[in-house]
Amino acid sequence: GKNILDNLTTGMYSDSKVIFREYIQNACDQIDLAITLGILSPGEGNVDIFMDTKKRYISIKDNATGVKAEDFVGDVGDIANSNKEIGKNKGFRGIGRLCGLAYCKTLKFTTSYLGENVKSIMTCDAQKMRAMLVENKKYTLEDIWDAIITYSTDEENPEEHYFEVEMFEINKENTDLLNEKKVREYLSFVIPVPYRNTFILRSHIYAYAQKLGYKIDEYCVRVNGFQIFKEYTTKLKEQSGAALKNYDEISRLEFKDFRNTDGELIAWMWVGLSRFEKQIPKVNAMRGLRVRSSNIQLGNDDALQGLFKENRGNYYFVGEVFAVSKNLIPNSQRNYFNENETRVVFEDLLREYFFDVLHKLYYEANRVKNDYKRQQEYLAKVSEYK
């Protein structure tokens, strides 16, 4: 009963910022569909996030297909109803749209479909839902849903097509959602956006993907007007007093395919090569090998850490692993893949590469550096006795 709704909203995610990823991935799916239907041309799709700290308000709006008025209640109002396909769509469980209920007083969905002169609105009393969830009463899921949802319509310009999610009166304990700097930093590695054009090695990534016949999905996403990019750079920095200074750089990229015994590509990756001076400090937000499905990051920068010979190995590198196989299915928290045979093969292949190639790269670099350091110390002592 009501426990299902609790699990799908307040109990689903440990990091409140995940709501942005959920709503953005839904918007990206609809942008893809809008391009397929000819509503948008490639490159015309946008997702705009607006946040007002004083009003504790957030809006996430796309210019994609929108939802037809006749389909609105069934598509948006039916819990976990989803017509999306595993392996094709970025979001496929249909539960992501509920995540905002945990973090605000009122959650509102507004949409209009091209050619229709009406906009459909669903308003959810999120505060009431949370109160009913903790009451000592045996509410059914339907009891709660019927009590918190209202539908309405209004006139709209037939030329308009969009879907908007609005969150009113963000909870005091979820103020992080209104921290524009933190949200932009979070989104820059999680959502499917382009590399920043100052990352000069990006052309090699696109060229390699093209050679494989793999399309890296990228969308224009803005936060209060600022476009979000993946914040990769060739410079590796370290703290030096109050400032940051460059201590190493990524000189080139190495690429690796991962294929099963039938020769089918299940994943591929790029990794940045440097002098491997040391473990990359935390001030480099891009550090670590990240795993991506449909160009959306799964988990954090440590998702693949357990596949290294030693945990610290992950942070000697910068790079991305792109899942290709449709059988690599993100779990409901989107922090890794569901367990299945393909995941076992994926992990075996990565573990072998991480052990045989990457571990040796930084281990040998460390050994040579330490040998050189010992040599310099010895020479210094020799010169003292001259």
Give, region by region, the residue ranges found by the protein language model.
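P-loop NTPase nucleotide-binding/switch module
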Residues: G1-N3, N7
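Glycine-rich ATP-binding loops of the HATPase_c
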Residues: T106-T110
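Alpha-helical oligomerization interfaces and scaffolds
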Residues: T10, V47-D48, K54-K61, V165, ...
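Interdomain "switch/hinge" adjacent to the Bergerat
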Residues: R21, A34-K90, G115-R287, Q297, ...
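Charged regulatory segments coupled to nucleotide-binding catalytic modules in large multidomain enzymes
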Residues: G241-K386
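Conserved ATP-binding N-box helix of the HATPase_c
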Residues: G11-I49, G96-A102
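Glycine-rich phosphate-binding loop
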Residues: E85-C104
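Generic recognition of stable, solvent-exposed alpha-helical segments in well-folded globular domains
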Residues: N3, V18, E22, V67, ...
